[in-house]
Curated annotation (Swiss-Prot):
The active site is at S127, K165. The gene is lexA. This is LexA repressor. Residues 28-48 bind DNA. Represses a number of genes involved in the response to DNA damage (SOS response), including recA and lexA. In the presence of single-stranded DNA, RecA interacts with LexA causing an autocatalytic cleavage which disrupts the DNA-binding part of LexA, leading to derepression of the SOS regulon and eventually DNA repair. The keyword Isomerase does not apply. SUPFAM superfamilies: LexA/Signal peptidase, Winged helix' DNA-binding domain. Gene3D superfamilies: Umud Fragment, subunit A, Winged helix-like DNA-binding domain superfamily/Winged helix DNA-binding domain. It comes from Lysinibacillus sphaericus (strain C3-41). Belongs to the peptidase S24 family. Keywords: Autocatalytic cleavage, DNA damage, DNA repair, DNA replication, DNA-binding, Hydrolase, Repressor, SOS response, Transcription, Transcription regulation. It is an enzyme of class 3 (hydrolase).
Amino acid sequence: MKKVSKRQEDILAFIKDEVRAKGYPPSVREIGEAVGLASSSTVHGHLARLEQKGFIRRDPTKPRAIEILEPEESIQKQHVIHVPLVGKVTAGSPITAIENIEEYFPLPDTYGTSEDQLFMLEIMGESMIEAGILDGDLVIVKQKSTANNGDIVVAMTAEDEATVKRFFKEKNHFRLQPENSSMEPIIVDQVSIGGQVVGLYRRVH
């Protein structure tokens, strides 16, 4: 990997942040202000070196035409965890959960630090569509036995049936609320939490 100076690292990070936030790169003046360089020619010099090292591409005919490149050698290897897909769970009426591991999915470790804390379930039904969870989606679930009001959870009823709903603890009962305005909530006296939905994976056919 080609080395860059601390100032060039700062410039590259600022360009990435601006593109991420605004959708377009900053001007030379904005770069200079961000990293403490008063001279535009000095900024141009750093940009030229970043371009020579393969980190950016510029179009000299346009004032903001800076394209961020990600050369293979500059990409830090991402830590991956393998999360088990343990079957299907309803997003409609509760059904008995299928808990056989079908396959493992590689996911970035931003979802968790220990593989045994996460699992995935395939959604059946349309009761969570207004939360963006569709029939056939795979939800990423962090194992936990408690939930806060409003969390989307995998809930197990007293009949050992599983469902994905938004959780609410209310006086004398629990409300498992669908995210579909045409469906009624499920009211139960007892419920156990299998985990909280923390992410979503969707196959595109």
